[in-house]
Design a protein with these regions (language model features):
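Kinked, hydrophobic transmembrane alpha-helices enriched for aromatic residues
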Residues: 1-47, 66-88, 140-144, 148, ...
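Membrane-interface helix caps and helix-loop-helix hairpins in membrane proteins
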Residues: 23, 126-133, 180-191, 240-249
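Hydrophobic core segments of transmembrane alpha-helices in multi-pass, intramembrane catalytic enzymes
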Residues: 33-41, 137-145, 193-204, 253-262, ...
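Membrane-interface helix-loop-helix regions
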Residues: 68-141, 172-180, 257, 261-265
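Alpha-helical transmembrane segments and terminal signal-anchor/GPI-anchor hydrophobic tails
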Residues: 194-203, 209-285, 289-292, 299, ...
């Protein structure tokens, strides 16, 4: 939920009227990528128990694909229908709704492909020109991570430090090797490739597997990381605006900054859970809709951005609108979850019946 809210907050600040007024579009874009990196780490943290319970690799993949693809497709269809109606007479927003590709462009394959979480670089490579509609660029990456998770989990169990170092080296290699592809416009962005983002997912797996050992040295780790980050802050202030890739979460160099920050965030949440379990338990009650929130938030923010003059709002008005948008996202996500859950459970029951 924290990662979802931070992404919503960053995308809200990147809307027209904020980016020009406060010149924060680039900074917020980088913070949003950092939040999605946190989302990858959380996904890795939660995947280890599923891998441990795995009895069959085939069944594991089926279950994970259903858990990811069914909510994605339901959100795609419901939001596409709603947005198509909302933007029926708005030419500026038609290109953001996939259904218009079928209604006016006859690009039926684009619409069908958009119903499944596919890496946008694959879509770009195939030249399908589909809209960034549901879940943005990272849902296809999550699916790829799930497919790699049994292998990554074994690596994390047997050699955590070596496997993390190898994943970072692989990230650097792929990122640099695809430089020419990005210049030739063959891929969307190098940093959104699955192989480039593996370290964050693997780091989450390692945090779960070795959480008890890390708990024993938590104090020393926190002090060491804070000293390290303080040194980076001094460098950041002295060289502002930063020219290097170290402070850009889209570049593999940023792993040396984002991974320690992710550990601090995980530790902070653990401390909050120990400090006030009841409050955190209430907050975690929203976690069931966090996936739907990540899928629908960009479309809802688009709708408000298109309808409201953000630049003309007062400071109070902008804060109030953020609260309204967040509330709408929560309500819509709950409704989407209610639509998706029966379909998802039906597919899972069919799968279990087939297995037995």
């Amino acid at each position: 939920m924290l990662a979802s809210f931070l992404v919503i907050y960053c995308h809200y600040l990147m809307c027209d009227g904020f980016s020009h007024e406060f010149r924060m579009d680039v900074r917020m874009y980088e913070v949003a990528v950092m939040c999605i990196a946190l989302f990858f780490a959380i996904s890795g943290y939660l995947i280890h128990p599923s891998v441990e319970r795995m009895t069959s690799l085939k069944d594991y993949y089926k279950k994970k694909i259903i858990r990811l693809a069914v909510p994605f497709t339901v959100c795609y269809l419901v939001m596409s229908a709603a947005m198509s109606t909302l933007y029926l007479f708005d030419e500026q927003m038609t290109e953001k709704v996939p259904l218009f590709h079928a209604l006016f462009g006859a690009k039926y394959f684009n619409v069908l492909l958009g119903m499944f979480p596919v890496d946008l670089n694959i879509i770009k490579f195939l030249g399908l020109d589909i809209s960034w509609f549901t879940g943005e660029w990272f849902m296809g990456i999550i699916l790829c991570m799930f497919l790699l998770s049994p292998f990554l989990d074994k690596c994390a169990v047997k050699a955590p430090i070596l496997s993390l170092a190898a994943s970072i080296a692989l990230s650097f290699f792929v990122y640099n090797a695809l430089d020419g592809w990005e210049e030739q416009d063959l891929i969307q962005t190098r940093w959104s490739m699955c192989l480039v983002r593996i370290p964050e997912f693997l780091f989450g797996i390692i945090l779960f597997i070795y959480r008890e050992k890390l708990l024993k040295i938590r104090g020393k780790l926190i002090v060491g990381i804070l000293i390290y980050l303080a040194a980076q802050l001094v460098y950041f202030v002295q060289t502002y605006p930063p020219q290097g890739a170290f402070f850009c979460p889209g570049n593999p160099y940023s792993f040396f900054l984002t991974l320690p920050v992710i550990y601090l965030i995980f530790t902070f949440v653990e401390w909050l859970n120990e400090f006030n379990f009841a409050a955190m338990n209430w907050f975690n009650g929203f976690s069931g809709i966090s996936y739907m929130a990540m899928l629908s938030q960009h479309m809802i923010i688009y709708a408000f951005n298109n309808a409201v003059d953000f630049a003309g709002l007062t400071a109070f008005g902008k804060i109030y609108l953020l609260l309204v948008i967040t509330w709408v996202i929560v309500v819509v996500s709950r409704k989407l979850q209610e639509c998706s859950a029966p379909v998802e459970n039906r597919f899972l029951k069919k799968r279990e019946a087939t297995v037995h």
